[in-house]
Amino acid sequence: MAKIINVIGREIMDSRGNPTVEAEVHLEGGFIGMAAAPSGASTGSREALELRDGDKSRYLGKGVLTAVANVNGPIRTALIGKDATAQAELDQIMIDLDGTENKDKLGANAILAVSLAAAKAAAAFKGMPLYAHIAELNGTPGQYAMPVPMMNILNGGEHADNNVDIQEFMVQPVGAKNFREALRMGAEIFHTLKKVLHGKGLSTSVGDEGGFAPNLSSNADALAVIKEAVELAGYKLGTDVTLALDCAASEFYKDGKYDLAGEGKVFDSNGFSDFLKSLTEQYPIVSIEDGLDESDWDGWAYQTQIMGDKIQLVGDDLFVTNTKILTRGIENGIANSILIKFNQIGSLTETLAAIRMAKAAGYTAVISHRSGETEDATIADLAVGTAAGQIKTGSLCRSDRVAKYNQLLRIEEQLGEKAPYRGLKEIKGQA
């Protein structure tokens, strides 16, 4: 038995200079797992609660000492003596101990950090890599895939201080033979984009996730400069590289309208979907995330109707990694893909349940970081261990993003042909 003998919580810093929760789980025999909770900027209203202290005299109210105390107090007491390999049982103990719908008593940041640390400790106890342990927890032992990265190389919206409304413009190196080559392609495009922007006299400062954040006149301009960079880097857009958008549309949804302030345009629900469809006809955009507000379910039905057969429509704020909400989406034919963020739901077990439900319904699952990250690379192991096929973990700079890419390089080196890189086949509507 992988007996838990100690649980430790502490306050550490995330990539935006805000506190977050780190946890350690110690087992008999000296096995230790350590993990940290990430934090989002554009958040869905139905996400599990990230517990902050609210003490304005400390970290401007963003301290997490209350959540840390919950780790070191009630969570530790409840888990001492339990078996770390029984992940579902551990997570349920913490969920029951919290007793709320959105984990606002103990904090999703406290529960998640312990949940992931326990998984890492259990993997160490079993003498296997974390991705292999996750595959076993998922009921798919030995079934792996290297994910196609969605690389956020140009930022707008909540992730940058500029006049671009769409939050993320991403490249996907779908023509690569393996993940290592995909990473190289993305890096070359990233550096070429810097030269293109510099040549136009535009800013090459970066946003929260490492993408550039220049002041462009429109969202179409953002796509145009990326196209230029891809081609200058020696790649063919639409064959070697495809494009993906994260609109984060909830951030500019006001009074039932989509207000693109940067463009000086206001759309109704169907009008904005038509606008996005027109972009997919001009550029090889194969994936659109949060193309409408999380509450605009009628609009989502229309968007899915006009694009769902050819474009991957990813629900992030829409589904918040929650199986109850995803069930409603599946039953109503809303979207065709789900973004998976650990901290939206708050435990590894619930995260795996959302991935399994999506796959069973023919939806894709895209594993994702948050804008506030740490050096913790657990999502890399999650992507491979569930054979999710796609990952979003930022641009090709900032060590909090690159840590995940480097872990994927190590995993690919270990697994070789056991973890194929399937490129375009992983993306809904493109197989």
From Swiss-Prot:
The active site is at E209, K341. GO terms for molecular function: magnesium ion binding; phosphopyruvate hydratase activity. Component of the RNA degradosome, a multiprotein complex involved in RNA processing and mRNA degradation. CDD domains: enolase. It catalyses: (2R)-2-phosphoglycerate = phosphoenolpyruvate + H2O. The keyword Iron does not apply. Belongs to the enolase family. (2R)-2-phosphoglycerate binds at Q167, K341, R370, S371, K392. It is found in: Cytoplasm; Secreted; Cell surface. Catalyzes the reversible conversion of 2-phosphoglycerate (2-PG) into phosphoenolpyruvate (PEP). It is essential for the degradation of carbohydrates via glycolysis. PROSITE patterns: ENOLASE. Its cofactor is Mg(2+). Pathway: Carbohydrate degradation; glycolysis; pyruvate from D-glyceraldehyde 3-phosphate: step 4/5. PANTHER family: ENOLASE. Binds a second Mg(2+) ion via substrate during catalysis. This is Enolase. The keyword Secreted applies. GO terms for biological process: glycolytic process.
